Amino acid sequence: DEAILNTNKKLIKKGDVHTHPVWRSVECAISSTRRIVKIAERYKKKAHILHITTKEEIDFLSQHKGNITFEITPQHLTLFAPDCYNKLGTYAQMNPPLRDKSHYDRLWYAVRNNLNDTIGSDHAPHLKVNKDKEYPNSPSGMPGVQTLIPVMLNHVNDGKLTLNQLINLVCENPVKIFGIKNKGYIKEGFDADFTI
């Protein structure tokens, strides 16, 4: 929600990445999500909402399933504030931001209860020289394509989700949602795409 972002911009503290989730607030996230759902429902269209990070969005979206699907990222299932900013500084800066543990816990609730439809990488890498810049001049984002599977397999090994859930979230559900033919499964007649 650009209006909320512009209003909150004054809350940014130069050099303090901890203010990133204050600027890009929960209110900003849920406002944008509500707007997308409202438009999709008004025009009876499908919408796939990326990078869900708040408990408010999880609660709202779980009541608007059907034509609405949504994604959570491995980053938001692995790191939470303020620990991530204390340990990683601007390397933990991304959009939407990493939030406190109550949001992290609700994201995992969504995964455990099959509320989210996909897990996506939000691949947005930057050069170290840029990530080392003082906040807010540091860019938001981190690598994701090459880390999605190893990070999520760690979560599988930790018992946070099953291997079958992970396969559904990263292989099977995306091809169903986007109508991609001959992908997402190991079946006769399908493309032989494998991760080893």
Regions found by a protein language model. Name each.
Residues 1-119:
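Histidine/acidic residue-rich metal-binding segments in metalloenzymes
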Residues 18-44, 113-119, 124-195:
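His/Asp/Glu-enriched, well-ordered alpha-helical/loop segment
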